[in-house]
Amino acid sequence: GLSIGVKVYHIKLSTDVTFDEVADVVKRENSNREISGIIIQSPVPEHLDFIKLVNLIDPKRDVDGLTDENQELLAEGKPRFVPATAHGVMLLLDFYKIPVLGKKVAVVGRSRLVGGPIAKVMGMKGANVTVCHSKTPNTAEITRQSDIVIVAVGRPEFINRSYIGEGAVVIDVGINSVYGEYSEKLEEEIPKRKLTGDVDFSNVFDIVSAITPVPGGVGPMTVLSLFDNLVSPSP
């Protein structure tokens, strides 16, 4: 934040914090004239409802674009803020000059935070969008026929080459912590944490025209998009 002249305040609360205690903090910052944007960092403790917490934020300061009001504006095609991950995906496609207009786009995952907003923004850009989810019977058939496949399901390396057509563009939004590395010397699994996406990167790499890595792909663009929403004047 400092590199672009933005002061960032990180308010850390205990894991046993109550909803009312968080609400008091958010309401205080809503009325602070020095604060232009507020986000709730996820995941939150299990006893708290993330969406209820988000809806405490003044929608004009909701730079993540996740409050009910901002989600409704997005659904109407008049977004105040494009949710950061969806915005980041579009910035990536724009930077690499990957066209969206008229393209077949499959979005795997329909969450409020990621899949839903991405599908909406892609539609606004003129793409032919199909959203796939756990109840979709022919997801692999749909994704194989798509020019762009965007994956956000929260399942490590779920998408392999059986889901991807030759020359497709793959955007992997997932980020998962997995453990385990086999050691022949010790003949056992060694607990070792690594981050992986929802796409089996090495399995599909040779058939795609472009793919985002995890980590280092969509994640940094999401952070950039938060700041872009912050410094861009909202309607």
Feature annotation, model-predicted:
Residues 15-19, 45-47, 177:
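Short, small-residue-enriched loops and turns at beta-alpha junctions
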Residues 50-71, 174-235:
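Rossmann-fold NAD(P)-binding glycine/threonine-rich loop
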Residues 1-15, 129-131:
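Short beta-strand elements in bilobed, periplasmic/extracellular small-molecule ligand-binding domains
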